[in-house]
A protein has these predicted regions:
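N-terminal leader/targeting pre-sequences
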Residues: 2-188
Length: 188
């Protein structure tokens, strides 16, 4: 069984994603999604945790699709707050620089700020992505965006933050410490 075969039963709500560019409409259907995620991605970030989160690992794949990108992310080893009401939600952003080094004050500080080529306020940065919902330390998500193509983000980094993004606080959503990082590299 391919890793994305299970999507066919759970994708009804994504039967149609509409994107208007250049006067035309784009309809993304189940068959299109299956052909996208079954192909080799154009780019991938292999993620690792910082010194406080050495078990954090994962990847984010970037697939070109029409006027944007399908992103598939899978992570494991995310920190967990105990209790039945803990949110365990983590912000995930593309940052401007493809450098996962840091300093004593901040892990992965060399990644810079959010990728924001049009100088938009948060949460309209091109690098703002949906949050990760962790389930006992594991998270998987897939989404479509027209904010960037895979080629526009190659050489940049994906950062996982310790908290959820509040989608309000400027300049970056009060998402907390940087706990994971991976440089986006081209694969084709």
């Amino acid at each position: 069984m391919r890793r994305f075969d299970f999507l066919s039963d759970n994708i009804g709500y994504m039967r149609r994603i509409v994107c208007k560019k250049g006067g035309g409409f784009l309809y993304l259907h189940e068959q299109s999604i299956m052909s996208i995620v079954g192909a080799r991605p154009a780019a991938r970030a292999v993620l690792r945790g910082d010194e406080k989160h050495p078990g954090l690992r994962g990847y984010a794949d970037f697939f070109p699709y029409r006027c944007g990108t399908v992103v598939i992310a899978e992570l494991w080893g995310l920190p967990q707050d105990p209790g039945p009401c803990a949110s365990n939600i983590f912000a995930m952003h593309i940052h401007a620089t493809g450098d996962c080094t840091g300093d004593m004050d901040m892990s992965f500080s060399s990644a810079g700020g959010h990728y924001n080529p049009k100088n938009c306020p948060h949460p309209a940065h091109a690098g703002d992505m949906p949050p990760l919902f962790s389930n006992r330390g594991y998270a998987w998500q897939g989404f479509y965006t027209d904010r960037f193509t895979p080629w526009e983000v190659m050489g940049r980094s994906v950062i996982i933050h310790a908290k959820r993004d509040d989608f309000t606080t400027q300049p970056s959503g009060d998402a907390g410490d940087r706990i994971g990082c991976g440089v986006i590299l081209g694969l084709r």
